[in-house]
Swiss-Prot record:
Keywords: Membrane, NAD, NADP, Plastoquinone, Quinone, Thylakoid, Translocase, Transport. GO terms for molecular function: NADH dehydrogenase (ubiquinone) activity; quinone binding. This is NAD(P)H-quinone oxidoreductase subunit J. GO terms for biological process: photosynthesis, light reaction. It comes from the Bacteria. NDH-1 shuttles electrons from an unknown electron donor, via FMN and iron-sulfur (Fe-S) centers, to quinones in the respiratory and/or the photosynthetic chain. The immediate electron acceptor for the enzyme in this species is believed to be plastoquinone. Couples the redox reaction to proton translocation, and thus conserves the redox energy in a proton gradient. Cyanobacterial NDH-1 also plays a role in inorganic carbon-concentration. It is found in: Cellular thylakoid membrane. Pfam families: Complex1_30kDa (PF00329). It catalyses: a plastoquinone + NADH + (n+1) H(+)(in) = a plastoquinol + NAD(+) + n H(+)(out); a plastoquinone + NADPH + (n+1) H(+)(in) = a plastoquinol + NADP(+) + n H(+)(out). It is a peripheral membrane protein. NDH-1 can be composed of about 15 different subunits; different subcomplexes with different compositions have been identified which probably have different functions. The lineage of its organism: Bacteria, Bacillati, Cyanobacteriota, Cyanophyceae, Synechococcales.
Amino acid sequence: MTEDKAQQKPSSTAEPTEPLATLERGPVSQFLADNGFDHQYLGRDAAGVELLEVERDFLLPVCTALYAYGFNYLECQCGYDLGAGQPLVSLYHLIKLADGADRPQEVRVQVKLPRQDPRVPSVYWIWKSADWQERETYDMYGIIFEGHPNLKRILMPEDWIGWPLRKDYITPDFYELQDAY
């Protein structure tokens, strides 16, 4: 019986194990890769939506290709801050609307931008719905959308200093309230 136990013990020498599962590209990422568009596939979120990351210099070519692929609706463009000293992110949630589709295909594209130079090309000329969404992201995070036809503050007063949703934003101690009359 002791011999059986000795044989059942795991060996102390580590045998090579199989590599961890790699991310299998989704159909949108595969389309972009097949057509030579530089991007990084980040996987899928809990809802099963593909998440891609592109460099800011490649945003317009990638978005133009996605529009040609059928992503005809920009559901949401937003920004977020990864934290003090970390990049800002511009995120695009695209949908392929088609007649008779049970569930439209979706993809999210993100661009990380350095805090010191948060510039990215505007996608307004591809999807007109980006107009006010890019303005709001500019107003709250200070991301500059180059080529936007009317990039100005939309929520805060024009003379407001700073970007209120950045994590390094310092809230003023005093707000000057003006009468609405």
